[in-house]
Design a protein with these regions (language model features):
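N-terminal amphipathic/basic-hydrophobic helices that include classical n-h-c signal peptides
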Residues: 1-22, 243
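Conserved SAM-binding loop
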Residues: 39, 134-137, 169, 202
């Protein structure tokens, strides 16, 4: 995972992308993974850290509120929305204070116990990296994601990592997925054609993330690791976990109608 390349696509690339839909039927070429709740089993740790940081600042957050209202947002927008719901308008200083405390609490938690990767993650990504371009698009912080991957066999599987530091507007806005695809195309090898949105699969665990993936014109797989499956019905495919996800099932999405 190298430093991000922010240069806009060249005119030739834009022309190739514009012409590509007429040249072939879309087929799977890239897989973009959310991280928290999809790759790493750490949503509970994030909630506990948020809850404690807010409690120290005189605010209360229930598990039902967190999962029902705020999960899926990046940390910055989550805090802004939470304080807007509970306080008298925006308060950047308070947001920054709580954000720093939450990060400190989460770091301490993960130092004591590294959040595990979900079952099936290593198997799926090890196979997928041989055939497709892989990326992470997460509202989590880059340092936390890199720490969770460090020392695993998939640490270097992803061509691109987009995190909360890279995007001003979080999910359900599609900006994070559009930007991730732009980065993937900027890093393609010389012989590779640009990937179109219609050739991407997004793997998500949240309602907001599924909405973002669909708005980016990508296929979406919902994994019911965080929400019940019945909450994820806007995904093109809903499965209990990544253990149930195979490359054949992902490829089959491109032969089916929405």
């Amino acid at each position: 995972l190298d430093e991000q390349e922010r240069s806009p696509p060249c005119r030739l690339e834009s022309l190739m992308l514009e012409c590509a839909p007429s040249m072939s039927h879309p087929a799977l070429r890239a897989i973009i993974f959310d991280f928290n709740g999809v790759i790493a089993d750490d949503e509970t740790a994030h909630f506990i850290a948020f809850q404690e940081a807010l409690r120290e600042d005189g605010l209360h957050l229930t598990k039902e509120e967190y999962y029902g209202r705020y999960l899926g947002m990046d940390e910055r927008n989550c805090l802004a929305a939470l304080l807007a719901d509970r306080a008298d308008g925006p308060n950047p200083d308070r947001e920054q204070r709580i954000h720093k405390r939450k990060a400190s609490l989460f770091y301490a938690y993960t130092q004591r116990q590294t959040p595990p990767l979900f079952p099936g993650v290593i198997r799926l990504i090890t196979r997928a990296m041989q055939q497709y371009r892989l990326a992470i698009a997460s509202g989590g912080r880059r340092e936390q994601i890199l720490r969770a991957l460090r020392g695993t066999s998939i640490e270097h599987a992803f061509r691109v990592l987009v995190s909360a530091e890279d995007i001003a507007i979080g999910k359900p806005d599609p900006a994070i997925y559009r930007y991730t695809l732009e980065r993937l195309n900027a890093r393609r090898q010389q012989a590779e054609l640009p990937v179109r949105p219609q050739e991407c699969v997004v793997v998500e665990d949240s309602v907001a993330g599924i909405a973002a993936g669909r708005a980016a014109d990508m296929k979406v797989v919902g994994v019911a690791t965080t929400y019940p499956a019945e909450h994820l019905t806007r995904a093109h495919l809903v499965l209990p976990s990544l253990e149930e996800v195979s490359l054949d099932r992902l490829e089959a999405l491109f032969t089916e109608r929405d």
